[in-house]
Amino acid sequence: MRSISGKELCRHLERQGWVLNRSKGSHFMYEKEGFPLLVVPVHGSKPLRIGTLKGLLRDAGLTEADLDAA
């Protein structure tokens, strides 16, 4: 699995219908009906750790293939 930055993940989530609810510092909170609040850490262009990315994808109902297709 390739790692991506928090910024890139945010852009992908927004294309999938997630809406930015609020942000506090470097953490962006996204919401989508039927899913729990998703907190994405955004630290510039620094890549997310693989475990963090996998957990966020799982919570968002997405797969690694969804990222590759974008």
PLM-predicted stretches and their roles:
Residues 1-11, 35-36, 59-61, 65-68:
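Long, low-complexity, intrinsically disordered polar/charged segments
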Residues 1-24, 29:
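N-terminal first-folded block
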Residues 20-51:
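A short, structured beta-strand/loop element
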Residues 44-70:
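C-terminal structural segments of small proteins and small subunits
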